[in-house]
From Swiss-Prot:
The gene is PLEKHH3. SUPFAM superfamilies: PH domain-like (SSF50729), Second domain of FERM (SSF47031). The modification Phosphoserine is found at S30. Residues 28-62, 554-586, 598-622, 750-793 are annotated as: Disordered. Residues 1-18 form the signal peptide. It comes from Homo sapiens (Human). This is Pleckstrin homology domain-containing family H member 3.
Length: 793
């Protein structure tokens, strides 16, 4: 029987008014049953009415359910009021911390600027923040906010555009309160008082934490643990959404970082990202994004560990048989593997995770899940803090529980492939390569460097190679849209680290060509710039080692492959040049036409690559003099073997002042008042001394041997203090670990000026940057003998 028209209209209007009241009603003191459907529902149940106290299986956690129009749940304002005793304005309550008149900005005030803040009397106690209509006795209470350890306070900050007042925001579980005051001191006083009250509260525990404690207490009884999982779906795999985090996260409306939502909302988003892994075609980028979120927000790391333990437990408890048969379920184990190689879980979460892995191994000993569990348990014992999240290549290797291959370039020995994992350090890779190349008994020290063209930087021994590879991947992604260049692309290389000892090198080993190629690379970069006669002698020795004896028909490399580029001449101030007469311009145009100039430039550009020794000797001009001198020195080396030429090259290069010195840009901080602003300098670390010079100059302004360094210590994150005699020098540089390693290597190297028994203290935790000593005076040249002296005549 159809309803009468009037009754039908009344029912529709009533439903419409209900919706309007929900959407546009008083949002501060009223609510609807559906309004808080995203909040979690926690229940503490007892197995029997006669039970006294909480037993190990008494806690039951259920997911929220959507309630109908008529709900037995408390409305949001009723829930808030039910926690506060009904009483009027307290007169002399000893629990009152601070009270006074403040303005309260209405909810959504930023979106509704036409609503002005309302003035009210606020009272802060040890339990709540209460709002009253007035300060008199019997005033009506307008609202209360229960304060717990999860509440947060932000501010004070001045809202110039909205109200012009100083505001302090207190965030609770259901809503937030923004208190405003025209005076900054008043806002700061309330902010400090609110933070002190919140800090004095005992930490809250979620029901999930209580369940973890029960599982830990019942770990010796598998049946009890299985019963806990059976009665609490929150611990098991689910395909539904998670409406609240598993761990206590602070309430708050402000984002913890750019591009992020509040922590509790980000925790729910993480769970959605985990569920998206099951059907992702390319899970690597999604996994990397989840790991990056945990790196940016450390508070979510334990939360994600628990979510992964939940999703790897199976729908029927740990471990679920459907999870072992579903290939998509392996994605959770793969992400858990990456997490265990990147972050360290907290104490309680770590214990629960280890127990979960052990139960998986015992239940499915020969399955792939057991292999993942064993791999994760080993990784948790070795993982320490990482600077960057794993690269896509590392994520792919970890998903298969395999090692990652990295390529290290060794001068004179080609490229070496080294198998690493997420915990391998640069020092371990350097030691493996030193042993593989037969350099274990060498007097020279070697280290791993990152290199790109002429740029290079030593890696500290404790640096994780996986972090370096991730940085290379990020830099390559940033430069993907840029034009490719010959020097684009970072790589790892093994290099000499410290002073060079060319004596006693075996002609049949890898060390001689290794040092030979590295010394030549340093000379091509102008580190150091030796005299011209030494450069020509070195070029002749390199030709002898590469081409053997001189022959006029041997194709030669270009001069820029043998000699460093000439130093740019100093620019003199421009002088006005007289304007030539028109006749001179006409004559120049007739003798030097643009077409002739173009042809001569093209001929000069082609001239270097395909020239032979005979053609170079017949050329004239400025560059031909250097080429002729190089060829003359090469002719005098007839009969010298390749190994002998390389050894002579190293011996001559080691005699150059400042050979192998490292250069770093530093900032000098004056220790005396009134000395002005800090100045930029170059710190040079040589084999015998360290020096300071101005950028672009070759002569040092300060030079001191290591034996005269009285103290060398770290004064800050990037500040180094050097004390020589009565003077102290403060230098600032970001390359702390590199300089610390290099200076310690030089201090450990015995020298006539600083014997092994020298009492100069080693550098401890010092940060430094050193410039290549491109100036004489860092090391004094030693005498030359044999064929080395003949080459420079």
């Amino acid at each position: 029987m159809p309803l009468p028209g009037g009754l039908w209209w009344l029912l529709c209007c009533r439903r419409g008014f209900t919706l309007l009241h929900r959407d546009y009603g008083d949002g501060e003191l009223s609510g609807d049953g559906d309004e808080d459907e995203d909040e979690e529902t926690f229940e503490l149940r007892t197995p029997s009415p006669a039970g006294g106290g909480r037993g190990p299986l008494e806690v039951t956690l259920t997911q929220p359910v959507r309630s109908g129009p008529v709900s037995n749940r408390l409305q949001s304002w009723e829930e808030t009021w039910s926690l506060i005793p009904e009483k009027g304005l307290p007169e002399d309550d000893p629990d009152i911390v601070v009270k006074g008149w403040l303005y309260r900005e209405p909810r959504g005030g930023g979106a509704r600027p036409w609503l002005p803040p309302r003035r009210a009397w606020f009272v802060l106690t040890r339990d709540s923040l209460d709002q009253f209509s007035s300060s008199g006795k019997g005033a009506r209470r307008l609202g209360s906010l229960v304060l717990t350890s999860l509440c947060s306070v932000t501010g004070p900050e001045r809202r110039r555009k909205e109200t012009g007042l100083w505001s302090v925001t207190v965030s609770g579980r259901k809503h937030s309160v923004r208190l405003c005051s025209p005076r900054q001191a008043e806002a700061e006083r309330w902010g400090v008082a609110l933070r002190e009250v919140i800090a004095s509260k005992a930490p809250l525990e979620t029901p999930t934490q209580l369940l973890l404690r029960d599982i830990q207490e019942s770990c010796g009884d598998p049946e009890a643990v299985a019963l806990i999982y059976l009665r609490n779906p929150i611990l098991r795999h689910t395909s539904g959404a998670l409406y609240a985090p598993l761990l206590p996260l602070p309430y708050g409306v402000s984002a913890p970082g750019p591009g992020y939502a509040p922590l509790r909302e980000e925790a729910v988003r993480l769970f959605l990202a985990l569920q998206a892994l099951e059907g992702a075609r390319r899970p690597g980028p999604l996994m990397q994004g989840v790991l990056q979120t945990c790196r940016d927000l450390p508070a979510l790391r334990d939360e994600l560990f628990l979510q992964l333990a939940k999703q790897t437990s199976g729908p029927a408890g740990p471990p679920g048989l459907p999870a072992t048969q579903d290939p998509a379920a392996l994605r959770y184990w793969q992400l858990l593997t990456c997490m265990s190689c990147t972050f360290r879980p907290g104490g309680a979460v770590r214990g629960h995770l280890l127990g979960h892995l052990e139960r998986t191994e015992q239940a499915l000993p020969d399955s792939e899940l057991a292999e993942y569990a064993r791999f994760i348990r080993k990784a948790l014992g070795r993982t320490r803090g990482r600077e960057l999240v794993p690269s896509l290549a590392e994520i792919s290797a970890l998903s298969q529980r395999q090692e990652l291959l990295c390529t290290v370039h060794c001068p004179g020995a080609g490229a070496c492939a080294v198998a690493i994992d997420s915990h391998t350090t640069a020092g371990e890779v350097a030691r493996e390569l030193v042993g593989r190349l037969g350099l274990a008994r060498s007097r020279n020290a070697f280290a791993l460097y990152e290199q790109r063209g002429a740029q290079e930087r030593a890696l500290a021994g404790g640096t994780l190679v996986a972090d370096v590879l991730t940085r290379f991947e990020n830099l390559a992604a940033e430069e993907a849209g840029l034009e490719d260049s010959p020097d684009s692309g970072w790589r790892l290389c093994l290099r000499l680290h410290g002073p060079l000892h060319p004596e006693g090198l075996s002609p049949d080993g890898h060390e001689l060509p290794f040092l030979f190629e590295q010394a030549h690379a340093l000379l091509l970069r102008g580190r150091p710039p030796p005299p011209d006669d030494t450069l020509r002698a070195l070029a002749a020795l390199r030709l002898q080692s590469l081409q053997r004896d001189f022959s006029p028909r041997v194709p030669l490399p270009r001069l820029d492959r043998l000699l460093p580029p000439p130093a740019p001449p100093r620019e003199d101030p421009p002088r006005p040049t007289p304007r030539p007469p028109p006749s001179a311009a006409l004559l120049a145009g007739a003798l030097w036409s643009p077409g002739l100039a173009k042809r001569r430039a093209e001929r000069a550009r082609r001239g270097g690559a395909g020239r032979t020794a005979g053609s170079i000797a017949r050329e004239g001009g400025g560059g031909a003099g250097t080429a002729a001198a190089v060829l003359g020195g090469w002719k005098r080396l007839r009969g010298m073997g390749r190994a002998e030429a390389m050894a002579a090259y190293l011996a001559l290069a080691a005699q150059c002042p400042g050979f192998g010195a490292a250069r770093y840009d530093v900032l000098e901080l004056s220790t005396e008042p009134g000395r002005g602003a800090p100045q930029k300098l170059c710190l040079g670390l040589g084999a015998k001394a360290m020096s300071l010079s101005r950028p672009g100059e070759t002569e040092p302004i300060h030079s001191v041997s290591y034996g005269h360094v009285a103290a060398c210590q770290l004064m800050g994150p990037h500040t180094l203090a050097l004390r020589v005699g009565e003077s102290q020098l403060l230098l600032q540089s970001p390359q702390v670990e590199e300089i610390m390693q290099l200076v310690n290597a030089y201090l450990a190297n015995p020298s006539p000026e600083r014997p092994c028994s020298s009492s100069s203290p080693p550098c401890q935790d010092l940060p430094d940057t050193s410039p290549p000593s491109q100036r004489p005076g860092l090391d004094e040249p030693q005498g030359q003998s044999g064929c080395l002296g003949q080459l420079q005549d």
